[in-house]
Amino acid sequence: MPNLTYKFITYKELIDGTYKDAYIPQDDKFPVTSHLTPSLRNAMIACPGNNDESKTFMKVCVDEENKEIGRAFCFGTRIKAGGRVYGAGTGFGFEVIEEYRKEGVGADLLLMTRNEFDFVLVAGISLKAFPLYRKLRYHLFEVQQFYKVRHARYVVKPRDLKGWLSLEKKTVKLKLKDIPNLIKYYELKRKVLIKKETIVPEWVTDMVANDGHQFMEVHDREWFQWNLDYNTYGFDEDIQSFYSVLDRNNKPLGFFMTKERLVQKSGPDKGLIRGTVVEWGACDKKALSESDINLLAMYSFSKRIDVIFTLACESDTASQLLRMGFKERASFKAGIKDKKKQLENIGDQQRWRLRYGMTNMIIL
């Protein structure tokens, strides 16, 4: 058994820069970058859930040479249960070098706590990590994800003349298949106004809080503004956008938020641009359905987008998305842990307002 040391790094250490003395990053050992970019540092300091500098920013496991072999970043959020709001911990960047995973480093990092929160909320759980969260007795949720190809290069990678001809043929097919969506889109646009916002409107707070679910992560105006203004890497291509949906008298009907990300990681998708519908809501789902919002969001993305991802959270959305040309993909996974078992029915997925844009998933 290797001699391992676990350390807590606080937000105060992040702010004053002394966190750099705690470990030696092993960037080349991880499938993604070290994460702690200047952009992410600024985002975490500005996070509306981080109001106590003494709380944990990062849990890290190091070897005898003080080199990082595992880590988990932490930050604060809030959950709403009925009429009450509770502080909750959450995190991201949970990674362990492969050869140490059998040593239980991953479980140790998740279990290691200073009892700063009674609840822990997680989202975007990977397929590999999902069994670990189940073993740690999290209440786990799965929501069906969907994707829609917008540019043929997402599925066709031309290397010769035949490949380029195939790309052009696929491009024409995609445009023809999209004609029914365009017709529905313009019909819907005659009824509503879509306004791109740089300052998130105040009415969003109540619209989200009163959507009818017993449990949810608190997504108020301040939280949305933070997600609009910051992201993890700070690349020029990384964009978040917020849109209000109004009736013809400028009365709020709903909203949606999107993000665009250039794939930087090596692999077949490198250089492609992904669009994601990360948040949405409506005051009257009969007047503006979840599938309506996805239709509006589809045409809000820049023309450079290669593929769009979204979730089907309402019961009838999945069939509508399939008609719009979306295809199913692996489920989106999230979870909650109620350490003191305070809240009844907290593990009932039907009582939760679930969105792709939970925890840090928008700024990522």
What are these regions (language model features)?
Residues 4-6, 11-64, 139-272, 277:
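Amide-forming acyltransferase catalytic core, primarily the GNAT-like/NAT-type
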Residues 48, 58, 76-82, 106-110:
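Catalytic micro-motifs at enzyme active sites that drive phosphoryl/nucleotidyl and oxygen chemistry
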Residues 59, 70-72, 89, 94, ...:
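Conserved GNAT-family N-acetyltransferase fold
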Residues 74-82, 258-264:
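Acetyl-CoA-dependent GNAT
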Residues 87-88, 273:
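Active-site beta-strand-loop-beta-strand hairpin of nuclease catalytic cores
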Residues 93-116, 286-299:
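Conserved acetyl-CoA-binding loop-helix of GNAT-fold acetyltransferases
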Residues 119-175, 231, 241, 256-364:
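Active-site/acyl-donor-binding loops of N-acyltransferases
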